Amino acid sequence: MPALAVAEALQRRGVEVSFAGSSERMEAELVPQAGFVFDSFRISGFSRRPGLELARGLARSLVAPFSCLRILRRRRPDVVFGGGGYVAGPMVLAAWLARIPAALSEADAHLGLANRLAEPFARRVFLSFPIADREKSKYRVTGRPLPERSRPPERAQARERFGLPQQGPVLLVFGGSQGARALNELVAERFGESGPAILHLAGERDYPALTERVKRPDYVLLGFTNEFGAALAACDLVLARAGGSVWELAAAGKPALLVPYPYATADHQAKNARCFVEGGGAISLPEGELERVPGLVLELLNDSIRLETMSAAMLRLARPNAAEEIADELIELARRRRKEAA
């Protein structure tokens, strides 16, 4: 959760931080666990199909800015930071109405719809990737902020934690919180009975069906893990989609074989992947060429020199100070507001 990384950086600078968001999303659990105050308001995304879900999303979006204004009056912040997505929009709009400076964060190489709608009300937009045709005075390319808890622990400890062998290469497979069915099916089919050691984060949807297809002790299949940093530390190569989590691979210096989700808005996952391919840290394949993945996995895991080269490239691409840069900019926005109000 990138907003937590920024909150931690602000806290280290002596700033008081509180969160606001939907009670129906993961932040309602993660934020209090991290020790921050959490205010909730009702908001949901828009369904792309006409019907009850679309009507509910529209109704909540109309009411949400007023709920956010009440939160702002109670908390009286000097600056607002929106972590991106539909939850951030109402709060950024409310901040604009209350004349409080606000900033947004974009995880992908394409400005999403929610951020495009909220962008006119923000003073800053922090980008994980460069995006063409954006006003330089408002946009900052910082990379994706990562919480300290996502930093990888020591390799041997991480492998012990997941029950993986201490010797030999390990492949990490994941497709985001919901998993990636095409990757899940491919890996279980090809490596379920033999192959390299694997840590497979399949997502809760596909996990039950896959358990019957894994036949060996060095293939560790999980629905999800709260210790993603440890999962990265345990592996030598990652097979994944190309969402915002690719920045965590870069920060950990993990070579990647990326299969962008082909139906992502504006093909942003392919754009994300391109950044890391051009930097030398990843290989990208379209989903239509999935049959090449097993061979590439084995080829890479058997080439330690190439893996080391790709790892070094990933570390060069990483932006480990993203949260610190954003925190400094937010503090400057808050200072300007106080100066203007004096």
Where are these regions (language model features)?
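Active-site-proximal region of nucleotide-activated glycan assembly enzymes
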Residues: 15-16, 26, 37, 96-156
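A short, well-ordered alpha-helix in the C-terminal region of glycosyltransferases
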Residues: 306-320
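C-terminal alpha-helical cap of glycosyltransferases
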Residues: 319-342
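Acidic donor-binding loop of glycosyltransferase active sites
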Residues: 77-79, 225, 233-247, 254-255
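Conserved nucleotide-sugar phosphate-binding/catalytic loop shared by glycosyltransferases and other
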Residues: 11-63, 67, 142, 204-206, ...
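Donor-nucleotide binding loops and adjacent catalytic segments primarily
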Residues: 25, 30, 34, 157-160, ...
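Conserved donor-binding/catalytic loop of nucleotide-activated donor transferases
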Residues: 98, 233-235, 250-259, 279
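Glycosyltransferases and closely related glycan-assembly transferases
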Residues: 67-80, 88-103, 116-121
